[in-house]
UniProtKB/Swiss-Prot annotation:
PANTHER family: CELL DIVISION PROTEIN KINASE, CYCLIN-DEPENDENT KINASE 14. Residues 455-468 have a biased composition (Polar residues). Residues 103-132, 448-468 are annotated as: Disordered. One of its GO terms (molecular function) is protein serine kinase activity. Belongs to the protein kinase superfamily. CMGC Ser/Thr protein kinase family. CDC2/CDKX subfamily. The gene is CDK14. Residues 134-418 form the Protein kinase domain. This is Cyclin-dependent kinase 14.
């Protein structure tokens, strides 16, 4: 069962503002060190606080900052506020199929600890953390605050994606950039895009990501009418792997959509664009409900709920699952929130207090506004679900109007839909690709091979599609 996040008490706001200011000022002083000429993942400082049940919970820095721009003054320092502490952080796993949502103690005290890892760097070779370490090759995409380039490391020759965020003198560093960097620095998983480096100058903040060839949206556009069932299964498994990893670390992605799921030329799927992500365990005000692209936004958020849990992401998983199989978006609203809800209720039924306890208390739920629909079998709306064993059952457990009824990522990985996959997939380490397991590979889609499609690059669209 999903607990609710408690609002931050007024007397704690001052402390969180101090944390904001300290971390924001420290952001410009990041000194990235490498032990050799290969890429190495970077870590985020984790602070532990006692929660209501007396268990350690994880706080990711910067996630209590209000969603505005943070002014950063450049100074020089070797202090890195994002290094891991020496103490180990305990994680709590859900004991049932429900999504995870933890309450944090209002009396908890934050005490960051920093451990430095020093290593010499070659005085003659370009260094990580400096603009001259990378060569721009071509422009991939552009957003309101950021431009994404395909680039190459001068250290080891590997391709990278350079997300260059323009800093305004008056506005400072965009907050979503700080949030994305602070979270990604601590995430090490094969199914999460890797942040290699951060470069800060007076004019720009550059996030250096691993280079990935395309995204799921473009892949589905290239192969209309639904993907190969075996490929759907492998893509979904990887998506759930990545989500399970971040959810166990109390992080919500909050913006799941095909454009934010990158796909390499070997078929690896990677979660990207963490500009809207949040660490759930941080005491704060309830979150903005303007966070997820409309088609993939869950009904509880559409109805005004701001009490989020990992269940928020699982609705998006269900929508993406159906879209991969059917070849069309599950709920392609054309007008507004009202239209989006009508499309959902047409399939799942108009909710009431019996089917969704508490729905009448949601700010935007007005029964008289909605047509009364009865729920349908999902195959009536999306017939291709009936062609794949156990697909309809899994989709129905993800697409639940009541968030507490949605399957968690960890539970979904154990669903019978995946029963024909090799058992070794569940034994992989976090950084191991599923394609290291024998006989696990993508099948050719109708019309074109994966390799040919990989040449049609859309990576820049995904990285520049954030709020930056």
């Amino acid at each position: 069962m999903c607990d609710l996040i408690e609002p931050q008490p007024a007397e704690k706001i001052g402390k969180m503002k101090k944390l904001r200011r300290t971390l924001s000022e420290s952001f410009s002083r990041i000194a990235l060190k490498k032990e050799d000429t290969t890429f190495d993942e970077i870590c985020v400082t984790k602070m532990s606080t006692r929660n209501c049940q007396g268990m350690d919970s994880v706080i990711k820095p910067l996630d209590t900052i209000p969603e505005d721009k943070v002014r950063v003054q450049r100074t020089q320092s070797t202090f890195d506020p994002f290094e891991k502490p020496t103490n180990q952080v305990k994680r709590v796993h859900s004991e049932n199929n429900a999504c995870i949502n933890f309450k944090t103690s209002s009396a908890g005290k934050e005490s960051p600890k920093v451990r430095r890892h020093s290593s010499p760097s070659s005085p003659t070779s370009p260094k990580f953390g400096k603009a001259d370490s990378y060569e721009k090759l071509e422009k991939l995409g552009e957003g309101s605050y950021a431009t994404v380039y395909k680039g190459k490391s001068k250290v080891n020759g590997k391709l990278v994606a350079l997300k260059v965020i323009r800093l305004q003198e008056e506005e400072g560093t965009p907050f979503t950039a700080i949030r994305e960097a602070s979270l990604l620095k601590g995430l090490k998983h094969a199914n999460i895009v890797l942040l290699h480096d951060i470069i800060h100058t007076k004019e720009t903040l550059t996030l250096v990501f691993e280079y990935v060839h395309t995204d799921l949206c473009q892949y589905m556009d290239k192969h209309p009418g639904g993907l190969h069932p075996e490929n759907v299964k492998l893509f979904l498994f990887q998506l759930l792997r990545g989500l399970s990893y971040i959810h166990q670390r109390y992080i919500l992605h909050r913006d799941l959509k095909p454009q934010n799921l990158l796909i390499s030329d070997t078929g690896e799927l990677k979660l990207a664009d963490f500009g809207l992500a949040r660490a759930k365990s941080v005491p704060s005000h309830t979150y903005s409900n303007e966070v997820v692209t409309l088609w993939y936004r869950p009904p509880d958020v559409l109805l005004g709920s701001t009490e989020y849990s990992t269940c928020l992401d699982m609705w998006g998983v269900g929508c993406i699952f159906v879209e991969m199989i059917q070849g069309v978006a599950a709920f392609p609203g054309m007008k507004d929130i009202q239209d989006q809800l009508e499309r959902i209720f047409l399939v799942l039924g108009t909710p009431n207090e019996d089917t969704w306890p508490g729905v009448h208390s949601l700010p935007h739920f007005k029964p008289e506004r909605f047509t009364l629909y009865s729920s349908k079998n999902l195959r009536q709306a999306w017939n291709k679900l009936s062609y794949v064993n156990h697909a309809e059952d899994l989709a129905s457990k993800l697409l639940q109007c009541s968030p507490k009824n949605r399957l968690s990522a960890q539970a979904a990985l154990s669903h019978e839909y995946f029963s024909d996959l090799p058992p070794r997939l569940w034994e992989l380490t976090d950084m191991s690709s599923i394609f290291t397991v024998p006989n696990v590979r993508l099948q050719p889609e109708a019309g074109e091979s994966m390799r040919a499609f990989g040449k049609n690059n859309s990576y820049g669209k995904s990285l520049s599609n954030s709020k930056h």
